[in-house]
């Protein structure tokens, strides 16, 4: 138990999930290992990792801190949408949120040297954590895709998560560049990035 703002004890546990079921928004009960629960559970894991990254940022990274906190807010929106069966509520994640993320990606892409091959995850401690976040995003995205083949979900949640992994990749590279940490390139692969292609060529 803990005290709320009025000095009243609030019980944190409900015991309603002791038999392996949980309730979605709207009241439907599903197993805790259902794809829907796995999807928004991974979203929670990602949000916690981002919170840790925020706590480790240096003063010079204050603008990044603000961005990451906004992403944490957006991830709660994503989790809410994933916990809402189709027709049981209004979705929160929008096309505009995806577009805002794309603008951030473009901005960070200009803050690191051009590369043609993959880079090994690592470098500055903050960049390493951002790469970790990128891989958790990918796992969350896989869960969402699995769910989308079973049930109707907000399409923009999947799109947002796809862009978010690109965001963390771009930011990790920008952080390494800012702190003058040289990236290690993957030496056994071919050209995977094509700078000659313009953004409009991909649309």
List the model feature ranges, each with a label.
Residues 2-203:
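Phosphate/pyrophosphate-binding loop motifs in nucleotide- or prenyl diphosphate-using proteins
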């Amino acid at each position: 138990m803990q005290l709320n703002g009025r000095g009243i004890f609030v019980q944190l546990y409900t015991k309603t999930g002791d038999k392996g079921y949980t309730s979605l928004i709207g009241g439907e009960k599903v197993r805790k290992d259902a794809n829907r629960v796995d999807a928004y559970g991974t979203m929670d894991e990602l949000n916690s990792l981002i919170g840790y990254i925020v706590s480790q940022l240096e003063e010079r990274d204050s603008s990044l801190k603000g961005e990451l906190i906004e992403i944490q807010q957006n991830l709660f929106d994503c989790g809410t949408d994933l916990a809402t069966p189709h027709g049981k509520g209004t979705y929160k994640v929008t096309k505009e949120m995806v577009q805002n993320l794309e603008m951030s990606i473009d901005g960070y892409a200009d803050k690191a040297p051009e590369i043609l091959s993959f880079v090994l995850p690592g470098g500055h401690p903050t960049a390493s954590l951002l790469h970790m976040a990128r891989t958790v995003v990918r796992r969350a995205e896989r869960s969402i895709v699995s769910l989308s083949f079973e049930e109707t979900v907000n399409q923009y949640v999947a799109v947002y998560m796809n862009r978010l992994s690109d965001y963390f990749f771009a930011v990790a590279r920008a952080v390494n560049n800012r702190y003058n940490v040289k990236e290690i390139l993957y030496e056994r692969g071919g050209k995977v990035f094509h700078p000659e292609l313009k953004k409009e060529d991909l649309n």
